[in-house]
Amino acid sequence: PHGNLRSNFLKFLRNFLQFIITFFLSFFYKIKKDDKIFISVATYAPWIKDKKFSYFFNFFKNFTLLDETRAYTLWKLSTDLKDKKGDILDVGCLLGGSGFIMSKNNKIGSVILYDSFEGFNESEGLHKKENIFFYENINFVKKTIKYLKLENTYVEKTFFPNNLKRKIKKIKICHLDVNTYKSTKKAFYWVEKKIIKGGVIIFDDYGIW
């Protein structure tokens, strides 16, 4: 509760650390009166007590670049919507970890993972020909799906939403992780027409590119 002993102690500790850090930085930088250093005291971390999530994340973390916080968001959403009609899309799946996480809880509909497996689209300006994820491989994802025995889970190689093999009618969750504005915009306008009432679209890397 707001104002309890723990909360007040964290606020005191935050203010103390801000003072110490500002003091030492002042020897190296010119700090203005209005300049502030922000230290978060947020302690809400529900994934710590979710033993089922922790168990699976310890395994799935080898197949994703998502941190525990973002992975838990996908886990929780897929749990909440597991009985809703519609498919789950993971656009920009890389090694498949984010899709695997959502697939583990799903009961109705398919989980479909999409990736070009070629890096960024050549039309993406500064990003063209920069295949920084050189270990992308669709066969690796297919084998992992089979190894994990994930039901109704598939992977397609494409620059989403072009040339999709499976017909998508309704979407209950879409995780967009395509790194660039142009690709994200194109995918979003396609997905929003098919998202169900109460469905969710998650933008990863928001504000980075």
What annotation goes with each model-predicted range?
Residues 66:
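Residue-level marker of regulatory loop/turn positions in helix-turn-helix DNA-binding domains and
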Residues 47-63, 75, 82-209:
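S-adenosylmethionine/decaboxylated-SAM
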Residues 69-73:
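N-terminal pre-P-loop "Q-motif" helix
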Residues 1-62:
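Membrane-proximal basic amphipathic "stem/tether" segments
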